[in-house]
Amino acid sequence: MIYRVKFNKGIKNIVIFLMPLFLFTYNVNAIEKLTAHGGPVKGLAISKNNEYMASASFDYSIVVWKLNPIEENNTLIGHEAAVNTVQFSPTESLLVSGGDDNKLLLWPLKYPLKKDKEIEPYILGEHRGKVVDLDFSKNGKYILSASWDGSIGIWDIKKRKNIKFLKGHRGPVYSVKYSKDNKYIYSSGYDGEIKLWDAINGEYIRPLVKNGWGVSVFEVNEKENFIAYGSTDGLIKVTKINEDKIILKIGEDRTPILSMYYLENENMISFGNAKGRMIILDTTNWSLIRDFNAVNGPIWDNILFPKDSSLIVAGLDDFLTRWEIFDFPPEILERPGPTRRFNPLKDVSNGEKQFARKCSVCHTLIANGKKRAGPTLYKIFGRKAGTLNGYKYSKALLKSDIIWDEHTINE
């Protein structure tokens, strides 16, 4: 059964804001969970030939997945901090990634990718703040990067160097894109603006959107004359590019929109928010296709797959969740239960609770701490803090005299 809602002019906004009252009672069954990371998954990308997918994680790694069927193919290690974003080049010969270490790494790809083969990255360059979004020019010659240092980087792939940093946003830049003809650059940020830039000379042209809250994600379709975007106040808006006209306004008050995916050929666009809600829209008439709870916690990224009508979401879990887009369950289900990691079901000590909520994102309790950002906590009692080799520790921790025991962990 497919829920497709159409709205009459003039009442669209009123009706849409009432949707959570009845649509949130529908929670569909996940098709499968895909596990390869050791921490939350922040970014997703799919190759142009639809044969591979990449996921970026807090565990400092990127996993390349083979599709049809979906299986882990390669784990890429090179970043020195959480990886936030990843993109395949139009030519499919490169993968670019950006992370909390402020760096952009280029990964050369040779198809078909040999399973478990190690790939050495090249350092393309770095920002002064973490890198949160990337985009290739349509000809595959240049890369755009969005950073929390407030700038947009333009990078020459062949020369492997920065051409220019564009500055104009007040605060972090959240998202960046090339126009289809490579003549323009679009960017959005904390300041609530979607800006238009000249891609040739880097000159700022004008704001396309002035929003009261930060614009987390956006898509521009020049041919159909619309800009769709999600903001930190929880609203999804669709406006005309050259007119001050709102086509659609939908959302959940004060729950930030964190991710977005535009499947242009299928006229579908999807949004994920900070509470695990997925909203999928038909861009031909801006009717609702799906609105449901996909995960507990933020949806940092999502991808729509046209071939099998499925959706993959990434969030706080160390696995990806794959859903069927169109099939609802035969009966109304309860909301998903507490997540296994962040909400312990039984009464536990404060130390156990803190590990369940926070520490297990980066640490394990087993000897092999592979694919975790931090050191293993195996046999931690009696160990002095900051003494395990192979990890970077803060000066404060190195100077501390903390010995891990039941008391220090519980406190």
Task: Please name every model-derived segment.
Residues 371, 375-411:
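Extracytoplasmic electron-transfer domains, predominantly the class I c-type cytochrome c fold
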Residues 53, 95, 143, 185, ...:
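Hydrophobic beta-strand positions that form the internal "hydrophobic ladder"
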Residues 345-366, 377:
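Sequence/structural segment immediately N-terminal to covalent heme-attachment motifs in c-type
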Residues 327-354, 370:
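Electrostatic cytochrome c docking/interface patches
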